[in-house]
A protein has these predicted regions:
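Conserved core of the PLP fold type I
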Residues: 78-224
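N-terminal basic, amphipathic alpha-helical segments
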Residues: 1-79
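Residue-level marker for buried hydrophobic side chains located in beta-strands
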Residues: 227-228
């Protein structure tokens, strides 16, 4: 009755496209100056188990429907690579990752305006391993980190596992992390690292403007705080 669902003849029921200017503003998180410990693992585990139930629509995580992925094309590529793989594919790579891959990434970094050396790069098995390594390098158990709110639950799990305390920084759908709020927190509370998802963050999908990105970098550089 709220106009969120519409019936289409001989097709079924569908979510109605929102009318222009009908966006509902999200309630922003309350700014708390003191860091807190998080305990989310049990709840996250329950949610992940529920996603395996075919009777449950998985709205709790940003998971792509398998039918939208090019599974057949990926399988063909993997099969081709497996047939052509040398004996090197059965061994161990150095801890920073396959040198040939890091060399190609270093070459590509020129187009990013960086010009990195292959020895400056570390490849990881997904983003969460990269975040774990970055936090290990910049924090110790008990330290405080700043994270946008709302955020991806995996980041809170990671903080919990590493015994880190978290300060939530309000985020907006249109602009991302509230830099004014972050600056206010940094003026009152020692923070060892700031974890910011600046491009289409999860779950809001916010894109921080280039001007705000530059402001964020300048703010943390002045205070010598790592930006992850």
């Amino acid at each position: 009755h709220d106009g969120l669902v519409e019936a289409r003849p001989k097709s079924g029921y569908f979510v109605r496209r929102p009318a222009p200017g009908s966006d509902v503003p999200l309630r922003r998180a309350r700014l708390v100056m003191s860091p807190t410990r998080v305990a989310v693992s049990s709840g996250v585990t329950a949610v992940m188990h529920s996603m395996r139930d075919p009777a449950v629509v998985p709205l709790a995580a940003a998971v792509v429907a398998p039918e939208l992925l090019p599974i057949r094309a990926l399988n063909r590529i993997l099969s081709s690579l497996a047939r052509e793989m040398s004996t090197a594919g059965a061994g161990y790579d150095p801890p920073p990752g396959l040198r040939a891959l890091r060399r190609q990434l270093a070459r590509r970094s020129i187009t990013w305006g960086l010009g990195l050396d292959e020895d400056e790069l570390v490849t990881t098995v997904g983003a969460m391993e990269a975040l774990h390594l970055a936090l290990r390098a910049t924090t110790r158990p008990g330290d405080a980190i700043a994270i946008g709110s709302p955020t991806y639950f995996g980041l809170l799990q990671l903080a919990e596992e590493m015994n880190l305390r978290v300060i939530e920084i309000p985020s907006c759908v249109g602009t991302g992390l509230d830099i004014d709020a972050l600056e206010q927190v940094l003026s009152h509370t020692p923070v060892k690292a700031v974890l910011a998802l600046t491009n289409f963050d999860n779950p809001l999908g916010a894109l921080m403007s280039d001007a705000n990105k530059e402001r964020l970098v300048r703010l943390l550089a002045r205070r010598d705080i790592p930006l992850i």
